[in-house]
Each structure stands twice: as C-alpha cells, then as structure tokens.
Amino acid sequence: MCLLGANAAGKTTTMKTIFGLVHPKSGTIEFEGKPIQNKLTGDIVTSGLALVPEARRIFPRMTVYENLEMGAFSRSNRVEVKQDMDHVCQIFPRIKERLKQIAGTMSGGEQQMLAMGRALMSRPHMVCLDEPSMGLSPILVETVFNTVLRIRDEGVTVFLVEQNASMALSLADRGYVLQTGKVVLTDTAKNLLTNDLVRQAYLGGA
C-alpha cells in the first residue's frame, strides 16, 4: 500500500507516529489486531514492523556488516540471523561486496540498499519505506522499486510513502491520499491512477 500527499501533508509524521517517535493526541494504532501506540519503539520493531526512514539514517561510522547486524538487535537465534544476512546479500549484491566498508563512504544508492537490508534483518511482517527514491538517479530508483516488488512478493507487506505518485501507485495494491493529516481518499491503486483528482494533484494531469 502507499500513502500520497503534498509536502507537509503529514506523511512522514504518520510514519513516525506508527513507530512511537511521535505520540498521537487521540485514537489508536493497531498492528495485526493489537494496539501498539503505547509501546516503545524497540518493542514495536519486535512486534513485526520495520522502518526505512527518509534520508536512510544508516550508522555512517560503522561497517556495512555492523549496520546489518543492528537490524537484528532484538533477535537471539544467530543461525537465523546468519541466514537472513545471506538472504539480504543475495537481494543486494552490492552490499555483499562491501560488508567491511564503512557505511558512510558508500554512495547514496548503496546506502539506500543498506537501509532496506537492515530493515529486513528484523524479519518484519511489514516494512515502512519513507521516500526511498529521494536523491537517487533514475537507474537507482528503478533498482530500489524492483527490490520493493521482490520484498512484497516474498510475503512482506510494504507501506510506501513516495513523492513519485505514479511509481508508488503502480507498485501498490491500495492507496491512501493524505491532506493536512487526514485521509481524504482511499481506493485500489488501479482506481486511484485513473481518479481525476489524483491525476490533477499528483500525476501532473496526465
């Protein structure tokens, strides 16, 4: 699923609220039928949610390998962690080539791959991606979104916040339109692609 909205509509705030970084004034937040709004961020991650934040937010002075290990901080089964490390390296071959490299010296696209890989190391049921294409070249954007499709096809739910509305809707099954913090429209992604209001506001009227 994807969340659309203009700048300052509340998309990133929505992500932060889900992960306990911003506290809602009212209402509840549920994941898999259980309330999570009063949980600590670490406990929210343990419950099956993972966040790839805007601007990636990797640990720049740590190695790529250490960054990936941080994604599995809540897990104790080292055999499974090693299996997931191998799986992440399979998804992102560039990461495998740079496991000993200091993460802050990687390119923007490589750092985005690392941030996504780190999120997968927690074995999430849902990955939340906040503006994954920001600052990337068109070729790298295509790589990132192909990876999003692969993650989805492996059975992980993807919640995508993305300025590229056309690309986001082409990947999603369902979309939500946010204005000043409120969901004003929701439908299947296919229907939103042909919705006149959505086309005018987010798809350039095409």
Question: Could you tell me what each predicted segment is?
Answer:
Residues 1-206:
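Glycine-rich phosphate-binding loops of nucleotide-dependent enzymes
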